[in-house]
Amino acid sequence: MHQVISATTNPAKIQAILQAFEEIFGEGSCHITPIAVESGVPEQPFGSEETRTGARNRVANARLLCPEADFWVAIEAGIDDNSTFSWVVIESVELRGESRSATLPLPAVILENVRAGDALGPVMSRYTGIDEIGRKEGAIGIFTAGKLTRSSVYHQAVILALSPFHNAVYR
């Protein structure tokens, strides 16, 4: 059984990680251990590079805390070009896989609040009245009328980031 360290305790992210790993490696093939680690970037990262750096830092910090694992996974959400997206970073002892998720354009009223210094999650909670929306469907769920959720978008990115781990051509 693969020991997978999730460098987050966010249920939406953990669900995406578990579902993707089980789809790639088989149901019941992994045990996910969520841990809280620092990203080393602001709570609301801006730009692709800052966001990817946050995910890479989370993986590095998770590896320090749990060096015995088989995989370390981080999902860092950010804002870039008036949209929200995330970077997924997955490492094993030998490999790294990275993928950027789909992007969701954000309304100007939401962006104004985020640019004023609030993170997207709290802004969306105020906008919708849903507590801790970032741990649930997120802005993605709200603005796609529930057709997609944070977890479903992250799931695709985790699947893509796992590609080097089960395709020999990457090695």
Swiss-Prot record:
- Which Pfam families does the UniProt entry name for this protein? NTPase_I-T
Needed cofactors: Mg(2+); Mn(2+)
Q: What is its EC number?
A: 3.6.1.73
What keywords is this UniProt entry annotated with?
Hydrolase, Magnesium, Manganese, Metal-binding, Nucleotide metabolism, Nucleotide-binding
Q: Which domain of life is it from?
A: Bacteria
Q: Where does Mg(2+) bind?
A: E38, E68
Q: Coiled-coil regions in this chain?
A: none
Q: Which InterPro entries match?
A: ITPase-like_fam, Non_canon_purine_NTPase, NTPase/PRRC1, YjjX_NTPase
An example of a GO molecular function for this protein is: ribonucleoside triphosphate phosphatase activity
Q: For this protein, what does the record note about how its cofactor is bound?
A: Binds 1 divalent metal cation per subunit; can use either Mg(2+) or Mn(2+).
Q: Which GO terms describe its biological process?
A: nucleotide metabolic process; thiamine metabolic process
- Which SUPFAM superfamilies does the record associate with it? ITPase-like (SSF52972)
Residues bound to substrate are T8, T9, N10, P11, A12, K13, E68, A69
User: Which reaction does this enzyme catalyse, per its entry?
Assistant: XTP + H2O = XDP + phosphate + H(+); ITP + H2O = IDP + phosphate + H(+)
Question: How would you classify this enzyme at the top EC level?
Answer: hydrolase
Q: What does this protein do?
A: Phosphatase that hydrolyzes non-canonical purine nucleotides such as XTP and ITP to their respective diphosphate derivatives. Probably excludes non-canonical purines from DNA/RNA precursor pool, thus preventing their incorporation into DNA/RNA and avoiding chromosomal lesions.
- Give the family per the record: Belongs to the YjjX NTPase family.
Q: How does it assemble?
A: Homodimer.
Q: What is this protein called?
A: Inosine/xanthosine triphosphatase
Give the organism the record lists.
Answer: Salmonella arizonae (strain ATCC BAA-731 / CDC346-86 / RSK2980)
Q: Please name the taxonomic classification of the source.
A: Bacteria, Pseudomonadati, Pseudomonadota, Gammaproteobacteria, Enterobacterales
